[in-house]
Amino acid sequence: MASYLYGVLFAVGLCAPIYCVSPANAPSAYPRPSSTKSTPASQVYSLNTDFAFRLYRRLVLETPSQNIFFSPVSVSTSLAMLSLGAHSVTKTQILQGLGFNLTHTPESAIHQGFQHLVHSLTVPSKDLTLKMGSALFVKKELQLQANFLGNVKRLYEAEVFSTDFSNPSIAQARINSHVKKKTQGKVVDIIQGLDLLTAMVLVNHIFFKAKWEKPFHPEYTRKNFPFLVGEQVTVHVPMMHQKEQFAFGVDTELNCFVLQMDYKGDAVAFFVLPSKGKMRQLEQALSARTLRKWSHSLQKRWIEVFIPRFSISASYNLETILPKMGIQNVFDKNADFSGIAKRDSLQVSKATHKAVLDVSEEGTEATAATTTKFIVRSKDGPSYFTVSFNRTFLMMITNKATDGILFLGKVENPTKS
């Protein structure tokens, strides 16, 4: 009997803006915990943050001097779900690549933590929209293992669709239509080039819309404000402007300003501006511990802030990036996904991640013991401190319930969408 190698395509679609929208009508059967200390969930949240920064550093190497934007929680959730059907080295590489020590952390605890994460990110809120979901488009002739099918539905709330891949263009259109609908039209054509060997497509999407707790007033936006790209090039951008009380601090160890701006609801944005020439130092130091330090150390003060109004998008072929982070076996002929389908040889042929971010006056739309000292200016000084994000800066959007990074990016040039 002939042996065929079929492709599993893993795609991640996401989008992030901030507007006033109706809340989702999802059930709230899984309340958010008041504390996540010493639980599988807390470990997943912390390791997801470290994974986010490791993936960020890899993307910086792969795409130098370019805008970066992605959803680490979307990527890690997709990989964890894929590991449910992996065996031997394939499973080990996925879970260790996500940062788990399999000697100390049982696999069941890992999936329990992700289950809690998925539930936490689907609890409806009247103040913001945050929707994350997964879908499997499976070749209709492929017989999925009952255990895998049950676990992806139970633990990851994934939808499963029987799909006719004998007509790749029709299958592709169906999958792209699903992602477009789930991201409210922001992520389009994420799937390209399906072929007759495609057996399964795994899609994860995340969509975020929220208003600033303290919005900018459009009449104060400056139309042509200079923004330094690199060391010599200047572009002109619409620069939002306001004077308000925000959580703010100066990280003297990492030579950067850190500004926290809250959204209405359960989300927070961090804007991080390193001193000139200190971006690389900052990037190398990013970790879950760094983010916790900022979250706990910033203090409210009057700030005059200038932030560009911008829209950026990014697309990544993760099959070329993840192997450099130790997740290699997934993409070659040695992959063992016998937990997905017993009789067919499967490997991941392509892993696509696409993200879109809009930041405006109203808000954002996006489709995850230390000795460092923070400085808060003396009340005897100026009445407010001015910080202008008029050169390369980092932005991350976090979820208060999980302390997880939903979106992470670097704005090199806000005029490039």
From Swiss-Prot:
Residues bearing glycans: N101, N390
Functional summary from the UniProt entry: Protease inhibitor that inhibits trypsin and trypsin-like serine proteases (in vitro). Inhibits plasmin and thrombin with lower efficiency (in vitro).
GO cellular component terms attached to this protein's record: cytoplasm; extracellular space; membrane
Gene that this polypeptide is encoded by: SERPINA9
Signal sequence coordinates: 1-23
Similarity remark: Belongs to the serpin family.
InterPro entries (alphabetical): Serpin_CS, Serpin_dom, Serpin_fam, Serpin_sf, Serpin_sf_1, Serpin_sf_2
Pfam families registered for this protein in UniProt: Serpin
UniProt keywords, alphabetically: Cytoplasm, Glycoprotein, Membrane, Protease inhibitor, Secreted, Serine protease inhibitor, Signal
Tissue: Highly expressed in normal germinal center (GC) B-cells and GC B-cell-derived malignancies.
Protein name: Serpin A9
Top-rank taxon, per record: Eukaryota
Gene Ontology molecular functions: serine-type endopeptidase inhibitor activity
